[in-house]
Amino acid sequence: MELYTALLAVTILSPSSIVGLPGECSVNVIPKKNLDKAKFFSGTWYETHYLDMDPQATEKFCFSFAPRESGGTVKEALYHFNVDSKVSFYNTGTGPLESNGAKYTAKFNTVDKKGKEIKPADEKYSYTVTVIEAAKQSALIHICLQEDGKDIGDLYSVLNRNKNALPNKKIKKALNKVSLVLTKFVVTKDLDCKYDDKFLSSWQK
């Protein structure tokens, strides 16, 4: 099962739905040094390209989120859209930012489009976000899903402030450093994506 489905299963579906994930996350993931936190943890990020490390991944998803950081804690609103089922998913995540300033592990709740909690976070599951590179309007992150502290699946995500943009040279260079090829990624502008910018913008107020 692809990571996106697993992430949603943790908060929305039965936890048993995640059985069959590929296992350990990538080990060559290094957080960016001297990340400009004020710039990264602001505004809305759109996922323009992603690579699910599960070779059996088939479902397609669109993703956007609005992360905020204050006092060493990251709080973010997350929006997923399943292209196949045409279903939208709303979540909010919270977790501590590590001392390097570019990595955090969070648990997330299921909410409605107005941000009202529907289901609290399951303490058994968490996800770790590592900012590998961030430059101007683009970024590269790695997401790892854990169950009881053990890795169960991961993906790489190229972000941009513009939902239809291409990654800049710095992001492409970062991909090369972790031995990834952009042509292997799913390009979300080729999908019939739907976004809920109102949900994310309300989180920013």
Swiss-Prot record:
Record organism: Rhodnius prolixus (Triatomid bug)
Tissues in which the UniProt entry reports expression: Expressed in the endothelial cells of the salivary glands.
E.C. designation(s): 1.7.6.1
Known cofactor(s): heme b
Protein name as catalogued: Nitrophorin-7
Record key words, sorted: Disulfide bond, Heme, Hemostasis impairing toxin, Iron, Metal-binding, Oxidoreductase, Platelet aggregation inhibiting toxin, Secreted, Signal, Toxin, Vasoactive, Vasodilator
Leader peptide range in chain numbering: 1-20
Family: Belongs to the calycin superfamily. Nitrophorin family.
Pfam families the UniProt entry points to: Nitrophorin
Disulphide linkage map: C25-C144, C62-C193
pH influence on activity: Optimum pH is 7.5.
Binding site for heme: H80, N91
Subunit structure: Forms oligomers (at pH 5.5).
Top-tier EC class: oxidoreductase
InterPro entries, alphabetized: Calycin, Nitrophorin, Nitrophorin_domain
Keyword Oxidoreductase: yes
Gene Ontology biological process terms, A to Z: modulation of process of another organism; vasodilation; venom-mediated perturbation of biological process
CDD domains the UniProt entry points to: lipocalin_NP7
Function: Converts nitrite as the sole substrate to form nitric oxide gas (NO). NO(2-) serves both as an electron donor and as an electron acceptor. Binds to negatively charged cell surfaces of activated platelets; binds to L-a-phosphatidyl-L-serine (PS)-bearing phospholipid membranes. Once bound on an activated platelet, NP7 releases its stored nitric oxide gas (NO) into the victim's tissues while feeding, resulting in vasodilation and inhibition of platelet aggregation. Also acts as an anticoagulant by blocking coagulation-factor binding sites.
Catalytic reactions on record: 3 nitrite + 2 H(+) = 2 nitric oxide + nitrate + H2O
One GO CC annotation: extracellular region
Entry's cofactor comment: Binds 1 heme b (iron(II)-protoporphyrin IX) group per subunit.
Location within or outside the cell: Secreted
GO terms of molecular function: histamine binding; metal ion binding; nitric oxide binding; oxidoreductase activity; toxin activity
Cross-referenced Gene3D superfamilies: 2.40.128.20
Positions of histamine binding: D52, D154
